[in-house]
Amino acid sequence: MHTLLDLRGSIPAYIHITDGKRHDSNELDEIVPEPPAFYMMDKAYVDFLSLYRFHEADAYWISRPKDNMGCEVSDHRQDFDTSTGIFGDFTIRLTTHKSKKLYPEPIRMVTYHDSETSNDVEFITNNFEISALEVANLYRHRWDIEVFFKWIKQNIVVKTLWGYSENAVRTHLWVAIIAYLIIARIKADYKSQYSITEVATLIRISALERVDLRDLITKPKNPIIQNQNVKELTLFDDF
C-alpha cells in the first residue's frame, strides 16, 4: 500500500494498493508533484528520472542515497554547527552514465550523526536554500508514515482477512483507510487535543455507552486539581 501522507494533518493524500511485484521506485510516476511542497521518501523510491521531474516542477524532495549511487563532490559548505549533529554539507553530481543523464543537475548531500543510535546518516535533496539541520529534521517526518501504518495494523482488524482474493483484500484495506479518515475528521471537527489513536480508543471503549461525542474526545478546559494541602486522617490520629 503506497501512501503519500500530508503532514499538515497526518492525512493520506494519495494511496495506491498494488501487489508485491511492483517496485517502489515506479510509484513516483503516479504522483503529480505540487510546488513548492517537500516530498520525503525512503531510498527504495529513489528514481532519478522521476526525481528530476519533481525538480523541474519546482517541488522539493529529500531521501537517502542508495548504496551503489556513484557521485563526486563539486562543492561543500561550512556554515553549520557540528553540535547539532551535522558533519557535512556537500554539493554533488552523479557520475554513472545512466544516472547523470537522468538527473543532470547538482544534488545536495547532508551528513548527520544520530546521537541516539550513534549512526552516521546521509540525506540527498534538490533544495539548497534551507539549512542542513532542517534537511535532517524534515526527513525525520518520513517516520510519520510508519505511525500511520502502525495505526492501520493495530486499530483496524486486518489480521483476519474477510477473504483471500485480491478484491477481498483491497476492500478490507479500503474500509480500514475510510475508518481512519472518519476518525481524523471527527478529531478535526471537535478540535480534540487527543491523537487519532486516542480518539479511536475512546470511541471503541465507549461504543455501548450513551455519551456525548464532544465530551468524550475533548479534554476539560479546567482539569480538576486535587488540593494537596488537605491533611488526611490516619489510623493513629487518636494516639
Name the predicted role of every residue range.
Residues M1-F239:
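Single, function-defining residue in the core of a domain
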